[in-house]
UniProtKB/Swiss-Prot annotation:
Residues engaged in binding GTP: 337-344, 384-388, 438-441
Ranges of biased composition (kind: Basic residues): 185-195
Pfam families: EF-G_D2, GTP_EFTU, GTP_EFTU_D2, IF-2, IF2_assoc, IF2_N
Gene Ontology terms: cellular component: cytoplasm; cytosol
Residue span(s) of domain tr-type G: 328-498
Region (Disordered): 1-44, 79-233
Protein name in UniProt: Translation initiation factor IF-2
Low complexity biased stretches: 21-30
NCBIfam families reported in the protein's UniProt record: IF-2, small_GTP
Organism listed in the record: Haemophilus influenzae (strain ATCC 51907 / DSM 11121 / KW20 / Rd)
């Protein structure tokens, strides 16, 4: 029955009630509108059946638990009784043992009690100490909190009251206002009006005051208004650094002013100021070298770390065979001397070849390199440097590559300027000298005179106790040439010259040029190792694989050992004379090194140009305009280009400057012609010619093109062109002198001087000076010149004439009239 009731009874009873109402509202147009609103209330009624079932189930569980507890209690009681009986039987046996153990246990308990007491006291002390510290911390915190909260306590309480009970406070205040208003209602109207006005005003004032107080308290809570206090956490302060931070500055080989300033954390203007103090004018983007940057950084108190940027270059050049055995090598001999003292003739006699006759103007224009083998198998390599002063740089390079210098001095000419230069170069290179006194076959030859003149330049012969060998020779007849070769070999034995023969080759570029058919050609003197066909060569800014090698006779060779000069083909461009040539293992790395060198060269060149521009700007500001002669130089070999450019730059004066706008090796091209047109330059070709396209441009643009094969002519013509650009000079030449013998008055011309021409010729149109007691008192011109009644243009010496001086009537007897003309004086450099 109960199960049926459970099944039929609903779990919960829900009754829904609806309430409808009408709400009237006003629309935007001002009309009233009624809206029906229905409110539904939902009520739930629960039955008690489920609760009754739950109570019944709970009673059953409690009865079962009680029954189990009673059973357990009975079992425990039985067990305890059994143990008690057992203990009663064992008690007599145990009593003796217990009496002994009791005394021991009592001792232990006493000891334990003492330890426990000590431990308790220690804990008590620690606890008291901790409590004391905690109490102090609490008091300190409380003190800080009180100090902190003293300013904000009242405002925070008021603000919290304002937030929590603002409604009640407002109601109470409104009630107070109403009571104040009702106090004066029973009085007369006037008094009421007066008092009411006052009360009304007072109530308004008090209300406003209360509102403003509440607002001030609220603002003070959040740090606003005049009473508000800003929190310390919201304030931000910046302390200026007390001193400049000094740091390590890493400087590469070149660096711009802006980059240096950035690394030192200073303004670029500081660096510019510092460099101005050091005498350097720079701009913010100017590239400066490592040494200058180091000086500036150290001056500003920074530690400088210099960085070498060519690690790749060092790695490539360092990867070489260094353990190879050294062997004796042939000496490299440079022949130096003055122009036409017989250097090439002597060398050609040694080589048994007549090359000197073909030299233009008797000057060796290129460095020649030859090696000759002696009868006993020994070998000597000769370098022939040009003798002209313009080839100083070439001769200096020759001295660097050489072991022994043979100084050729003509016995009939003695020591000349280039002879002295050659001595200086030899000393600078540290190369020992052997003097060959040439042309001893001439009747005017004087060997003792040469020795005496060289003695003045610290070249002391063995005869005078020195170490320099003097060998008299005749290049024309061959006298003494064998003695000269023996002297060279003797000197080389003293020097003990050795070199690695089998390793990777290295050497120096003696000369280079661009061949129209073969491309870049470089003459290289191998200094160590063996240069082979197919080797990869790094040579200054250029690199390449050796495609072909030729000796000085034009014969193909496959390899060249130490002290052997060879012509090399296969480089990427024309290297500069004097560059080191090195064989490397990897062509790709050689290319990278060459490109790196080109980039660094451009940077350094740019830095130099910018510096020159600034220096020129400041010099031009002080000097004014300077005439410039623009020149484009093209020559057949690099050494000639360098020598000509240097000679032209040395021709510059304060009034006329030679500006080399372009230079290069090879023929004159269309590019050179267009550059000459743009820069208004003259083109100078030294042993080269213009091609067809260049000639067309030169003719069309009427460019000044000049060819030379002798450097003297080139320099003389450039000097003549520069002389034409000089500002002319003028001087006054006296051409006639007349003495005043009498003075006449003329109605038209005023005072007319009757004169006798004592010197030269008096001309009508020339300027004159009037001298009295040899002092110039007037300078002007003639108005009239007459002989008797005729106007004449000139009157010669010893003749009389009448002279009328324009705008001057104070002529007296005894005065002298000096006639002169202004003559232009031709200037030259």
């Amino acid at each position: 029955m109960t199960e049926d009731v459970k099944a039929d009874a609903p779990k919960k009873l829900s009754i829904q009630r609806r309430t409808k109402t009408t709400v009237s509202s006003t629309t935007t147009g001002g009309k009233s509108k009624e809206v029906q609103v229905e409110v539904r209330k939902k009520r739930t009624v629960k039955t008690d059946i489920a609760q009754q079932e739950e109570a019944k189930l709970k009673a059953q569980q409690e009865a079962e638990a009680k029954k189990i507890a009673e059973q357990k209690a009975a079992e425990e009681k039985a067990r305890l009784e059994a143990e008690k009986a057992k203990a009663e039987t064992a008690k007599p046996v145990k009593s003796a043992v217990d009496s002994k153990a009791k005394s021991v246990e009592s001792e232990k308990e006493k000891r334990k009690a003492g330890e426990a007491e000590l431990r308790r006291k220690a804990e008590e002390l620690a606890r008291q100490k901790a409590e004391e510290q905690a109490r102090r911390a609490v008091e300190e915190a409380k003190r800080y909190a009180e100090a902190d909260d003293s300013d904000n306590e009242s405002s925070s309480e008021d603000y919290s009251d304002y937030n929590l009970s603002s409604r009640y406070a407002l109601e109470a205040e409104d009630e107070e206002d109403r009571r104040n208003e009702n106090r004066g209602r029973g009085k007369n109207k006037v008094a009421k009006a007066k008092k009411g006005g006052r009360d009304d005003e007072n109530s308004k004032n008090s209300k406003n005051e209360r509102e403003s107080n509440r607002k001030n308290q609220k603002d003070a809570k959040f740090g606003k208004g005049k009473n508000g206090k800003k929190g310390a956490a919201l304030q931000q302060a910046f302390t200026k650094p007390a001193q400049v931070v000094k740091s390590d500055v890493v400087i590469g080989e070149t660096i711009t002013v802006a980059e240096l300033a950035n690394k030192m954390a200073v303004k670029a203007t500081e660096i510019i100021k510092m460099m101005m103090k050091m005498g350097e004018m720079v701009t913010i983007n100017q590239v400066i070298d490592q040494e200058t940057a180091q000086l500036v950084a150290e001056e500003l108190g920074h530690k400088v770390i210099l960085r070498n940027e060519n690690e790749l270059e060092e790695a490539v050049l360092g990867d070489r065979d260094v353990n190879a055995e050294k062997v004796t090598r042939a000496p490299v001999v440079t022949i130096m001397g003055h122009v036409d003292h017989g250097k090439t003739s002597l060398l050609d006699y040694i080589r048994k070849a007549k090359v000197a006759a073909g030299e233009a103007g008797g000057i060796t224009q290129h460095i020649g390199a030859y090696h000759v083998e002696m009868d006993d198998g020994k070998m000597i390599t000769f370098l022939d440097t040009p003798g002209h002063a313009a080839f100083t740089s070439m001769r200096a390079r020759g001295a660097k590559a050489t072991d022994i210098v043979v100084l050729v001095v003509a016995a009939d000419d003695g020591v000349m300027p280039q002879t002295i230069e050659a001595i200086q170069h030899a000393k600078a290179a540290g190369a020992p000298l052997v003097v060959a006194v040439n042309k001893i076959d001439k009747p005017e030859a004087n060997l003792d005179r040469v020795e005496q003149e060289l003695l003045q330049h610290d070249v002391i012969s063995e005869k005078f106790g020195g170490d320099v060998q003097f060998v008299p020779v005749s290049a024309k007849k061959g006298t003494g040439v064998d003695d000269l070769l023996d002297a060279i070999l003797l000197q080389s034995e003293v020097l003990e010259l050795t070199a690695v023969k089998d390793g990777m080759a290295s050497g120096v570029v003696i000369e280079s040029y661009l061949d129209k058919g073969r491309g870049p050609v470089a003459t290289i003197l191998v200094q160590s190792g063996t240069l082979r066909k197919g080797d990869i060569v790094l040579c200054g800014f250029e690199y390449g694989r050796v495609r072909a090698m030729r000796d000085e006779n034009g014969k193909e060779v496959d390899e060249a050992g130490p002290s052997i000069p060879v012509e090399l083909l296969g480089l990427s461009g024309v290297p500069a004379a004097g560059d080191e040539a090195t064989v490397v293992r990897d062509e790709k790395k050689a290319r990278e090194v060459a490109l790196y060198r080109q980039g660094k060269f451009r940077e350094v060149k740019l830095a130099r140009q910018q510096k020159a521009k600034l220096e020129n700007m400041f010099s031009n500001m002080s000097e004014g305009d300077v005439a410039e002669l623009n020149v484009i130089v093209k020559a057949d070999v690099q050494g000639s280009v360098e020598a000509i450019v240097q000679a032209l730059n040395e021709l510059s004066t304060n009034e006329v400057k030679v500006k080399v706008v372009g230079s290069g090796v090879g023929g004159i091209t269309e590019t050179d012609a267009t550059l000459a047109t743009a820069s208004n330059a003259i083109i100078v070709g030294f042993n080269v010619r213009a091609d067809a396209t260049a000639r067309r441009v030169i003719e069309a643009e009427n460019i000044d093109l000049r060819y030379y094969s002798i450097i003297y002519e080139l320099l003389n013509e450039i000097k003549a062109a520069m002389s034409g650009m000089l500002e002319p000079e003028f001087k006054q030449e006296i051409i006639g002198l007349a003495e005043v013998r009498d003075v006449f008055r003329h109605p038209k011309f005023g005072a007319i001087a009757g004169c006798m021409v004592t010197e030269g010729v008096v001309k009508r149109n020339n300027p004159i000076r009037v001298l009295r007691d040899n002092v110039v008192i007037f300078e002007g011109e003639l108005e009239s010149l007459r002989r008797f009644k005729d106007d004449v243009s000139e009157v010669r010496n010893g003749m009389e004439c009448g002279i009328g001086v324009k705008n001057y009537n104070d002529v007296k007897v005894g005065d002298q009239i000096e006639v002169f003309e202004v003559v232009e004086v031709k200037r030259s450099i």
